[in-house]
Amino acid sequence: MHSLQAKILDPRLGSDYPLPAYATAGSAGLDLRAMLQEELTLEPGQTALIPTGLAIHIADPGLAALVLPRSGLGHKHGIVLGNLVGLIDSDYQGELMISCWNRGQSTFRIAVGERIAQLVLVPVMQAHFQLVESFDESQRGAGGFGHSGSH
């Protein structure tokens, strides 16, 4: 298991509400909580920036973190991330904030301490451009947007 530096920015995290943890041995994501001062109401179409009460420093340029929606919130209530996926660079040290978007048809209430997103650590490979005049031919070429078939 990889070690990750973390700072608790909201004292309720770790006392009133559990620290992020893997739910099972096979879980890929750590749940992030809405560390709000009071319950928040999201009307259909509305977005809000939600604090997690947690800052991390990955420190390893070979790693990054992704903030992803929780499947149940999206499927059952239409609550997804406003930016669809959050990317946390290895050198970022600020608070993790969650952009929540109510794409559903009903008002949704986010309770203080509710699990609203998940954090997944992923490997990163940085690349540099090798500028060329043309590419070696591939079977696909420049075809896109359904070019490879529908089934």
UniProtKB/Swiss-Prot annotation:
Looking up InterPro entries in the UniProt record yields: dUTPase, dUTPase-like, dUTPase-like_sf, dUTPase_trimeric
Q: Which GO terms describe its biological process?
A: dUMP biosynthetic process; dUTP catabolic process
Output the superkingdom of the source species: Bacteria
As cofactor, the record names: Mg(2+)
* Protein residues bound to substrate: R70, S71, G72, N83, L87, I88, D89, M97
Q: Which organism is it from?
A: Azotobacter vinelandii (strain DJ / ATCC BAA-1303)
Alphabetical keyword list: Hydrolase, Magnesium, Metal-binding, Nucleotide metabolism
What name appears for this protein in its UniProt entry? Deoxyuridine 5'-triphosphate nucleotidohydrolase
* Pathway given in the UniProt record: Pyrimidine metabolism; dUMP biosynthesis; dUMP from dCTP (dUTP route): step 2/2
**Any Pfam family hit:** dUTPase
Q: Which family does it belong to?
A: Belongs to the dUTPase family.
Role, per record: This enzyme is involved in nucleotide metabolism: it produces dUMP, the immediate precursor of thymidine nucleotides and it decreases the intracellular concentration of dUTP so that uracil cannot be incorporated into DNA.
Show the catalytic activity. dUTP + H2O = dUMP + diphosphate + H(+)
Any GO MF annotation of the entry: magnesium ion binding
